[in-house]
């Protein structure tokens, strides 16, 4: 028992003391009102409960932004239209940037990837290319954006269509999901790490790639946090960035828990720094 106490004490000493950013970066982001849509990594309740600070708290300190936070634990792309409705009800057009950081729960829920478009052959008039005459009708393939809430791409289409309609003059930025470690959050919420495929046979990489595709489909910037943030929960050397990197007993239930899915304050600070320097390349205000 004494040996266990000594090990725990040493682990506590090894945890990093998270310093606040030394100074604000002077940029076009100072004073920008940024709405954050997403899941548990964005959820403000983790700050309110004292679990850890978040990337958007650190962005306030790094860039001087103002945060409007709508992310909710467990939410998927299918919840983004509802978060958008709440943003509209609360702030109307008084927002500069909408940032969407979601998708990891779609992977965990085994949501099929689906398609961006359906396709059909239609008869259409074509004028202008060499060899065509005015009024000539010809068969051409035509695609239609799929609004399908049962697939990942379809959900993104629904959400982005709503955001583009509601905020045509605002900066909308997508963030990819980040790497996933194992998480034993409760007896009813056990999630294996990213080396495991989900229930439809897809790895989390596929869900990251689809968000990157969405940038081209919907003409919005995508920041690939999965690649640039540096958080890699599969490596023991990265244990210092996660909320509960090793099995430990819950103070409430006494049951063992682990969490390499949610960054701790040190992890969120690293996220924020990576994100801040990417954001410097984009305008914060378009209208």
Where are these regions (language model features)?
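Catalytic His-Asp segment of secreted/periplasmic serine-dependent ester chemistry enzymes
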Residues: 47, 177-287
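Sec-dependent signal peptide hydrophobic core
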Residues: 5-9
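Solvent-exposed loop/turn segments at secondary-structure junctions
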Residues: 40-43, 72-77, 103-109, 178-182, ...
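Oxyanion-hole/transition-state-stabilizing segment in secreted/luminal serine hydrolases
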Residues: 49-50, 79-150
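Generic structural signal for well-ordered alpha-helices
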Residues: 84, 156-160, 208
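Positively charged n-region of N-terminal signal peptides that target proteins for export
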Residues: 1-4, 170
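Hydrophobic h-region of N-terminal signal peptides that target proteins for export
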Residues: 10-18
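Serine-esterase "nucleophile elbow" of acetyl-processing enzymes
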Residues: 19-73, 78, 83-94, 98, ...
């Amino acid at each position: 028992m004494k040996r266990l106490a000594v090990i725990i004490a040493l682990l506590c000493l090894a945890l990093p003391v998270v310093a606040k950013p030394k100074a604000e970066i002077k940029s076009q982001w100072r004073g920008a009102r940024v709405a954050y849509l997403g899941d548990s990594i964005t959820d403000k309740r983790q700050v309110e409960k004292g679990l850890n600070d978040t990337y958007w708290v650190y962005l306030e300190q790094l860039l001087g932004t103002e945060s409007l936070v709508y992310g909710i634990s467990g939410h998927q792309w299918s919840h983004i239209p509802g978060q958008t409705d709440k943003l509209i009800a609360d702030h109307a057009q008084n927002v500069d940037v909408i940032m969407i950081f979601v998708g990891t729960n779609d992977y965990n829920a085994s949501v099929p990837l689906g398609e961006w478009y359906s396709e059909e052959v239609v008869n259409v008039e074509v004028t202008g290319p060499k060899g065509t005459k005015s009024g000539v009708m010809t068969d051409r393939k035509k695609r239609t954006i799929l609004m399908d809430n049962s697939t990942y791409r379809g959900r993104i289409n629904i959400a982005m269509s709503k955001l583009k309609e509601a905020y045509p003059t605002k900066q909308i930025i997508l963030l990819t999901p980040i790497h996933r470690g194992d998480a034993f959050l409760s007896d009813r919420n056990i999630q294996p790490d990213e080396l495991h495929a989900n229930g439809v046979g897809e790895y989390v990489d596929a869900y990251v790639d689809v968000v990157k595709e969405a940038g081209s489909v919907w003409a919005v910037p995508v920041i690939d946090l999965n690649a640039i943030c540096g958080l890699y929960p599969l490596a023991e050397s990265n244990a210092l960035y996660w909320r509960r990197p090793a099995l430990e007993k819950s103070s409430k239930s006494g049951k063992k828990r682990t969490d390499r899915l949610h960054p701790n304050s040190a992890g969120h600070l690293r996220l924020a720094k990576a994100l801040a320097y990417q954001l410097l390349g984009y305008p914060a205000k378009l209208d």
